[in-house]
């Protein structure tokens, strides 16, 4: 049976919950068109997160890996285009580490592009009435760290496996502590992630439509 690995993070930065894990854990053992979804939680810690991710990939042997993370302040489901080879932490991770201008992989390439049909995924999610867009940066914190490490592994050892990263907004119960910050319901995020998986599994060549940004 084909399997999809989807990951979410533990809470960080003083939050009580992390929306990525709150939604992703609901998808564990879900069957979609003959494909089994396996959900795993990652620690919000440099190095440790990649160790946990690599262990999960070894265990699950997936055809698709989707890593999900919180992007407080963003209003859309944002599907990441690129990961860069740098850790530059504005705040410490959950183990107190705060790397500055450190490469994720020594001698690794400057960046990796996603292995997902991101524009087709954005279009499909929007057609379901859920705000979505292509993101040009995954940041320089643990989310980018995981995305880069994932793509490095897939490019080096699992070239047939699709993979990438999706950022999601706060849940409403978080946004009440961040006045003015946008949020999205867990149900909407769940629908968006199910669509993302379905489209990623079906589409081999992405749509040739705009998804860029002017800044």
From Swiss-Prot:
The record places the active site at 80, 143, 167
Q: Which PROSITE patterns match?
A: PYRASE_CYS, PYRASE_GLU
Q: Which Pfam families match?
A: Peptidase_C15
- The main location is cytoplasm
Give Gene Ontology CC terms. cytosol
* The EC number(s) this enzyme carries: 3.4.19.3
Q: What does this protein do?
A: Removes 5-oxoproline from various penultimate amino acid residues except L-proline.
What protein is this chain from?
Pyrrolidone-carboxylate peptidase
């Amino acid at each position: 049976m084909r399997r999809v690995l989807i990951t979410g993070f533990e809470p960080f930065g003083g939050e009580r919950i992390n929306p990525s894990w709150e939604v992703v854990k609901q998808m564990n053992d879900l069957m979609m068109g003959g494909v089994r979804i396996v959900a795993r939680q990652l620690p919000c810690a440099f190095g440790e997160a990649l160790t946990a991710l690599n262990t999960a990939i070894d265990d699950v042997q997936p055809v698709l890996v989707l890593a999900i993370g919180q992007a407080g302040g963003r209003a859309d489901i944002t599907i990441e285009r690129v990961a860069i080879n740098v850790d530059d932490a504005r705040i410490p991770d959950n183990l107190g580490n705060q790397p500055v201008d450190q490469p994720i992989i020594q001698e690794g390439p400057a960046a990796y592009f996603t292995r997902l049909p991101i524009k087709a995924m954005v279009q499909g999610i929007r057609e379901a009435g859920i705000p979505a867009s292509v993101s040009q940066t995954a940041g320089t914190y643990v989310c980018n760290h995981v995305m880069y490490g994932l793509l490095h592994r897939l490019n080096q050892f699992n070239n047939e496996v699709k993979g990438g990263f999706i950022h999601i907004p706060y849940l409403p119960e978080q946004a009440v502590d961040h006045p003015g910050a946008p949020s999205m319901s867990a149900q909407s995020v769940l629908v968006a992630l199910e669509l993302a998986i379905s489209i990623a599994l079906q589409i081999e060549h992405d749509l040739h439509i705009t998804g860029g940004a002017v800044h």
